[in-house]
């Protein structure tokens, strides 16, 4: 009888563990990514440009320094929030781009052009 109780307990634990993993992967698949490139006026990748991403619901701001190819990436974003994205480098600034919660794409790709003077 003890053996059977242990077996039932083990099966219950395994079922619970599998359901938790499935829920986590489902939640992960619902998250969104914003990625892209920062370029200067001449369309050259702007290495070291700082990209700012602001969650308009929480006002939380995340930043990312563009790599040697001007690339940036923000992942794990809430699909139910709106965001503003812009880049800055050495006194230049890009236009602020909007990412809407109504846009159902899981991955948003942007080109941020540094063409304005920073305020």
Q: Which role fits each region the language model picked out?
A:
Residues 74-77:
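Short, flexible loop/turn segments at beta-strand junctions in immunoglobulin-like
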Residues 70, 81-91:
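A short, solvent-exposed beta-strand micro-motif common in secreted/extracellular proteins
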Residues 57-71:
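Short, acidic Ser/Thr/Gly-rich low-complexity loop/linker segments typical of extracellular
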Residues 94-101:
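Edge beta-strands of extracellular beta-sandwich domains
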Residues 35-46:
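Structural motif
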Residues 8-17:
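Bacterial N-terminal signal peptides
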Residues 44, 49-55, 85:
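Hydrophobic beta-strand segments
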Residues 23-27, 101-119:
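Extracellular beta-sheet/turn segments enriched in Thr/Pro/Gly and aliphatic residues
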């Amino acid at each position: 009888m003890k053996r059977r109780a242990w077996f039932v307990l083990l099966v219950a634990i395994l079922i619970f563990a599998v359901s938790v993993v499935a829920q986590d992967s489902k939640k992960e698949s619902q998250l969104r990514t914003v990625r892209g490139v920062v370029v200067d006026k001449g369309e050259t990748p702007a290495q070291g440009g700082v990209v700012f991403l602001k969650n308009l619901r929480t006002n939380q701001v995340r930043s990312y320094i563009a790599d040697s190819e001007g690339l940036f990436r923000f992942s794990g974003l809430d699909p139910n929030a709106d965001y503003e994205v812009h880049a800055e480098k050495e006194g230049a600034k890009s236009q602020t781009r909007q990412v809407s919660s109504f846009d159902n794409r899981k991955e948003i790709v942007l080109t941020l052009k540094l063409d304005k003077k920073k305020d």
